[in-house]
Amino acid sequence: MAESLLSLDDLAVQFKVGSMLAGGIKTLKAVDGVTLDVKPGECLGLVGESGCGKSTLALAIMGLVLPTRGRIHVGGQQISGDKPPDRMAMARTVQMVFQDPYASLNPRQTVRRTLADPLHLHGVGDKAEVEARVIDMMAKVGLRPEHADRYPHEFSGGQRQRIGIARALILKPKLVICDEPVSALDVSIRAQIINLLLELKDEMGLAYIMISHDLGVVEHVSDRVAVMYLGRIVEQGGWQEIFENPRHPYTRALIAAIPDPFHRAAATVAGAKAKGEIASALNPPPGCHFNPRCPIKADLCTVEAPVLEGVAPGHLAACHFRDRLI
């Protein structure tokens, strides 16, 4: 079995919010004890509703927020701890494609400078080599070389996201975190960007973490899927196991919401739909965080948090009644 490219061990990210003058200081548990791994060349889908902690987890992996607890290993090297990680070294291994192509690009920089700056910063090649890599990367993402001196406002949303993808890949990283990479784009071009990401994954040997609330996208691109709810992983496994045999009520609720007749098996299970809205991470429910919305909860669920345990080879679920959900 291949060594993990990325390993997270009991990772937690907490923020202090409020003030002593406004009701006191509270702790927001954005990420709460996450253990995950990503293999080289693999695509891990990370799904859940807004507010589940997916983007905060991504920022912790990138070194943009410091974890409160736990360890992060990238390529066998621990990057978490008391000191901030070496951002220069991290950038050569892990990169990120952001959700909003309109906000993630510097409006004062041309495409050429946007792509060349990381190469200059890391001392990659001379002027001719930098230019060659910029033009080559533009071609890889479907941009015309003669547009290298244009500014972001001269491109469509889909083209801007292609620039963002090119910027993420220009240093040839091993892992790319895609944070809702198509949610801000027109429906008509979402498939183009997803297919581009898949082509680049195969061509460059990339591993992805694909963050999305759109399970249709995740099913299409992922080898494995992790389901996150209020900072915790509640289920993970191979994409086929997750979509065809979900063993957590929250996963079933997400699948039931897909407007796709091929997934009606999960949707027609009695009580598949979740009740109400996601709770606040400032005041999560005791026990299983999903219990206020769960259609099969019992008294145990309100006092004891279930452990993420195996239900099949490579398939884990955190539910006291995981064995009943078959």
Locate predicted features.
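The feature captures the beta-strand-to-loop junction immediately N-terminal to the Walker
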Residues: 47-48
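Helix-to-loop junction immediately C-terminal to a conserved catalytic motif
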Residues: 62
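Conserved ABC ATPase "signature" region
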Residues: 128-146, 255-256
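Conserved ABC ATPase signature
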Residues: 151-155, 159
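P-loop NTP-binding/switch modules centered on Walker-like glycine-rich loops
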Residues: 174-177, 181-185, 189-267
